[in-house]
């Protein structure tokens, strides 16, 4: 029997398109909200990713790439209002994308958390959001290419050989300065 999107969301226990929150462990006055990205997040996403790519910790993302894949992104933002370029008056502190690659395969991409918010479970919650969405779409294999495999192992992923991934995933890699000598580690989780 066909289940509507709403029924599938309810079965998953979470509606991926509505925000959720966590409290920062060492600062109970700070709350981080997780939601899908909005058009006004693009500049903040670009700045976050650029900071990591300049440090060699992440592959760069162009503005056009962020716009094209905006629907893939989850955002983590503080509940504390700030002034500046932030989308809704809150500070964007992390982001992550789930990119569907093939029939039963998706990639977690562009996982980044601002340095002051690192090691506060924000990255773990962003991954969890992506895994819930993958489950909603009945995708059971989720991989990532990462410079931080231990973080993904902590979150239930296993290291795999890059040769286990389909050739299609390398289409993004052609424009990378490190292609074909990729120094990232491939990790995968099966739901």
Protein language model features and the residues they cover:
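C-terminal "cap" of GNAT-fold acetyltransferases
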Residues: 15-20, 165-191
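A short beta-loop-alpha structural element at the N-terminal edge
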Residues: 31-45
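Active-site rim helix/loop that mediates acceptor-substrate recognition in acyltransferases
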Residues: 47-81
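Conserved beta-strand in the GNAT
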Residues: 75, 89-100, 104-112
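Conserved glycine-rich acetyl-CoA-binding loop
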Residues: 114-125, 137, 154
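Conserved acetyl-CoA-binding loop-helix of GNAT-fold acetyltransferases
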Residues: 119-132, 144
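Conserved GNAT acetyl-CoA-binding A-motif
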Residues: 134-147
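Conserved active-site alpha-helix within GNAT-family acetyltransferase domains
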Residues: 146-172
């Amino acid at each position: 029997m066909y289940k509507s999107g709403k029924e599938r969301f309810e079965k998953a226990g979470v509606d991926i398109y509505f925000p959720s929150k966590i409290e920062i462990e060492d600062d109970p006055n700070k709350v981080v909200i997780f939601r899908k990205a909005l058009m006004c997040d693009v500049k903040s996403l670009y700045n976050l990713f650029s900071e990591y790519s300049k440090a060699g910790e992440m592959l760069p993302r162009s503005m056009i790439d962020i716009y094209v894949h905006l629907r893939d992104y989850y955002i983590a933002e503080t509940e504390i209002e700030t002034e500046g370029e932030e989308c809704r008056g809150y500070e964007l502190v992390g982001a992550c994308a789930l990119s569907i690659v093939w029939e039963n395969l998706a990639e977690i991409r562009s996982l980044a958390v601002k340095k002051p918010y690192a090691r506060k479970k924000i990255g773990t919650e962003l991954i969890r959001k992506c895994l819930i969405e993958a489950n909603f779409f009945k995708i059971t294999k989720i991989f990532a290419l990462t410079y931080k495999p231990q973080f993904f192992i902590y979150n239930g992923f296993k290291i795999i050989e890059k040769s286990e991934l389909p050739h299609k995933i390398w289409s993004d890699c052609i424009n990378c300065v490190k292609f074909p000598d990729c120094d990232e580690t491939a990790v995968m989780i099966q739901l």
